[in-house]
Amino acid sequence: MQIQDQPHIGVLGADPAAITQFLRRVQALGGEHAVLLPLSPAAVPDCEPYLCGASTQPPLPKLRAAAEVLAASGCTVIAVPDSAGIFCEQLTAAAGVPVLSTADAVLPQLVGALHQRVSILCTPGVRAANAYGLTAQRYGLHCGYPDAPVQALLGCVRPEKACSEQVLRSIIELELARGNDSVVLDSAQLCAAFAH
């Protein structure tokens, strides 16, 4: 298969670490070949403070311009594996190609699971924007987030800390014991904690 015949997938994010983690996961999956074009535009304001209301610097203008670059480069779909996923509708409108967040990719996979209750372990910004809650409604899923003490523990999980995987596994077990059928990790940092 010639490179021009392969799917071209843009990978867009404000957080280079999230893009790197996403690319590692795609590589580990193997499967069909696709051309992946990662782009993390310079000087994009951090999405987290903006989504939490702690900053007035909107990341959307730079992200919109980057999505347009990816579409102009031949990408037929764009994945957004970080907090910037909350802007997928606006990015799709700007780029003219589908722009998918982690929520858009994960939640349809959970339809039909037991009682369809899912707990989302994510950053404070994703939680504040209720990115998963809004998407879950489209699929008839009940989406929840950990309570404040558990959310605070999530902030302590770092890939470089030896205890992080154990803490994260305990949080997952707690969320399952609370009646959730599934637990979704929506953070490059949380996913990387399992890699060490």
Please report, for each region that a protein language model flagged, where it lies by residue.
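Non-catalytic structural scaffold of enzyme domains
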Residues: M1-H196
